[in-house]
């Protein structure tokens, strides 16, 4: 089932808020299985003040965080996890392949490959204009 979530609906699912909410919308959601979201990267992002003033580049760790937030929406849409919190449990095989700069639309995709008990694993890919910017395997742990 595909579903569109605006920023207000995202905020009902995950606890992140400005300046750390890094997802603007979810355009596809298969509950408990996968999600696709977007972050419109603007020159006004707080992190560009120091990373780097003369050549702004979105920090890779924040690209991973944006992917984790989309993953949290995917896993928390599973009926048994609704109303809970998803913690970032770990990262494997992270690769950064392209700079993300002001003006980019960052497409954030995750497919949950395994859920066992209160833990999950997802394959995450961030792209800009169809080119991979970052990819990683993300681990989630569900809290109360």
Curated annotation (Swiss-Prot):
Domain of life (superkingdom): Bacteria
Keywords, sorted A to Z: Cytoplasm, Lipid A biosynthesis, Lipid biosynthesis, Lipid metabolism, Lyase
Location within or outside the cell: Cytoplasm
GO terms under cellular component: cytoplasm; membrane
Family affiliation: Belongs to the thioester dehydratase family. FabZ subfamily.
HAMAP family: FabZ
Protein name in UniProt: 3-hydroxyacyl-[acyl-carrier-protein] dehydratase FabZ
Natural source organism: Clostridium botulinum (strain Okra / Type B1)
């Amino acid at each position: 089932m595909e579903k569109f979530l605006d920023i207000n609906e995202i905020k009902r699912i995950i606890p992140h808020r400005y300046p750390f909410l890094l997802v603007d919308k979810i355009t596809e959601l298969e509950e408990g299985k996968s999600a696709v979201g977007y972050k419109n990267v603007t020159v006004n992002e707080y992190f560009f003040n120091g990373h780097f003033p003369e050549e702004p580049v979105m920090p890779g760790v924040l690209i991973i965080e944006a992917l984790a937030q989309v993953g949290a929406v995917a896993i928390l849409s599973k009926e048994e996890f609704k109303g809970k919190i998803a913690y970032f449990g770990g990262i494997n095989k992270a690769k950064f392949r392209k700079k993300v700069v002001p003006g980019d639309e960052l497409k954030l995709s995750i497919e949950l490959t395994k859920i066992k008990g209160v833990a999950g694993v997802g394959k995450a890919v961030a792209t800009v204009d169809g080119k991979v910017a970052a990819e990683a395997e993300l681990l989630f742990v569900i809290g109360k």
